[in-house]
């Protein structure tokens, strides 16, 4: 495992759409492992592959309940809304209030290639939406309603 460089600010990779992962192999496993180590080292709760310069649909999240790894994640259901302050490892020093769904259901693949569904509320819902936005070149600053 290795700590990877987190892309920041105006790095163009942060604005690009990520590609679907076709094959889950040792390279994807290494990417997941490195992303987890990088996220923990940076004291983050989530990290998307574009943040480490890889345009693949891969995210990792840990809001204190254990690590979640998702490949090709997609939001399949959103319920309600919540507003809270967000920050981002790729935008150090920036924060702002962002409206997100209160509850989300996300479908994706785990590292074994098995389809899984995760339902998140509160911080987990927010983190899932935030990291999936990264896969589409969207930053939380695009959605700030109040700084």
From Swiss-Prot:
Catalytic-site annotation from UniProt: 131
GO biological process, one term: translation
CDD domains tied to this protein: Pep_deformylase (cd00487)
Pfam families registered for this protein in UniProt: Pep_deformylase (PF01327)
Coiled coil segments of this chain: none
EC number(s) stated in the UniProt entry for this protein: 3.5.1.88
Keywords (A to Z) from UniProt: Hydrolase, Iron, Metal-binding, Protein biosynthesis
Cofactor(s) in the UniProt record: Fe(2+)
A GO molecular-function annotation: peptide deformylase activity
InterPro entries tied to this protein: Peptide_deformylase, Peptide_deformylase_sf
Presence of the UniProt keyword DNA-binding in the record: no
Record text on cofactor binding: Binds 1 Fe(2+) ion.
Superkingdom per UniProt: Bacteria
Binding annotation for Fe cation: 88, 130, 134
The reaction(s) this protein catalyses: N-terminal N-formyl-L-methionyl-[peptide] + H2O = N-terminal L-methionyl-[peptide] + formate
Keyword Protein biosynthesis: yes
Its job: Removes the formyl group from the N-terminal Met of newly synthesized proteins. Requires at least a dipeptide for an efficient rate of reaction. N-terminal L-methionine is a prerequisite for activity but the enzyme has broad specificity at other positions.
HAMAP family listed in its UniProt record: Pep_deformylase
PANTHER family assigned to the protein according to its UniProt record, in alphabetical order: PEPTIDE DEFORMYLASE
Protein name as annotated: Peptide deformylase
